[in-house]
Structure formats: C-alpha cells, structure tokens
From Swiss-Prot:
Residues 49-139 form the ATP-cone domain. Keywords: ATP-binding, DNA-binding, Metal-binding, Nucleotide-binding, Repressor, Transcription, Transcription regulation, Zinc, Zinc-finger. Belongs to the NrdR family. Negatively regulates transcription of bacterial ribonucleotide reductase nrd genes and operons by binding to NrdR-boxes. A zinc finger (unnamed) spans 3-34. InterPro entries: ATP-cone_dom, NrdR-like_N, RNR_NrdR-like. One of its GO terms (molecular function) is zinc ion binding. This is Transcriptional repressor NrdR. Binds 1 zinc ion. Pfam families: ATP-cone, Zn_ribbon_NrdR. One of its GO terms (biological process) is negative regulation of DNA-templated transcription. Transmembrane segments: none annotated. Its cofactor is Zn(2+).
Length: 155
C-alpha cells in the first residue's frame, strides 16, 4: 500500500483488529520510508448475484424493490421496521451464500416467502397470493391450511 504522506510503496502493518461486528478489518500501518503512521479499513466486496427472470432476462438485484414488495405485504401489520430490515439482511446473506453470479428469481421469491412466514402469516398469504398467482378462493384456502399444519414460526 502506498504511504499517503510520501507515496512510498513499502508499508508494514503494526496492528490489525476486527471492527463493525467482524465485517471490517482496521489496520494501523507504518511507512518504512518516512515513519508516518496511518489507518486503513478493509471490507470484503460483496456483490449480489444477478436475477434470472422467468422469461430468461437478467437484471441486477434491487434491494429497494425487495423492500417495497415486503412492505406492501406487511402493510398495516404489527411488524417493526427493525424486524423487516433483519429479514432483508438474511435474504441478502442467503443469496450471497449461494456463491453464484446469477440465481433464478424463483430462489429470491422462495426466500421472501420463508422470511414473511416467520414475520407475519397474513403478510405471507398476501405475498403468496400475488407471487403464486392465486386464481380462486380454493387456492387461498389450501395455502392457509398448509400454513396451519406447519409449526408456528411467528409466535
């Protein structure tokens, strides 16, 4: 790393510590040429995978679109912004954990449904009705019955 004081390219690391809940490394460095000390921060560059839509087109992951869709499902439901943000963070982490450059949008949809089922069952049904394109009352009934058979995740 170049010294910000004299532009020499020989520096040594004096101290390294994890910061920001382990997501960042803080390093104290010393320039071998001029002796000045400075601090650097390192973070991993975490790139979200692109989404492959059902029609085969590809688009970048859009966190705001994800948030808006989940907020729409959670509208007028007793779920805090903090819990919503935690769910979004888990979805993003799971997408990154695939290690893939591209994932099918269906994967994202299923992750959203899993998180919504943990947050609020009504929001889950709202989202599922649009996502799975429910056509009639029977499809709603079947999904509600399936949800009722599962152990409660939101209580």
């Amino acid at each position: 790393m170049h010294c910000p004081f004299c532009a020499a390219n020989d520096t040594k690391v004096i101290d390294s510590r994890l910061v920001a809940e382990g997501d960042q490394v803080r390093r104290r460095r010393e320039c071998v040429a001029c002796g000045e000390r400075f601090t650097t921060f390192e973070t991993a560059e975490l790139v979200m995978p692109r989404l492959i839509k059902q029609d085969g087109s590809r688009q970048p992951f859009d966190e705001e679109k994800l948030r808006a869709g989940m907020q729409r499902a959670l509208e007028k439901r007793p779920v805090s912004v903090e819990r919503l943000e935690e769910a979004i963070a888990r979805i993003k982490q799971q997408l990154r954990a695939t290690g893939e450059r591209e994932v099918k949008s269906l994967v994202l949809g299923e992750l959203v449904m899993t998180e919504l089922s943990k947050l609020d069952e009504v929001a889950y049904i709202r989202f599922a009705s649009v996502y799975r394109r429910f056509q009639d009352l029977n499809e709603f009934r079947e999904e509600i019955e399936r949800l009722a058979r599962e152990p409660s995740k939101s209580r």
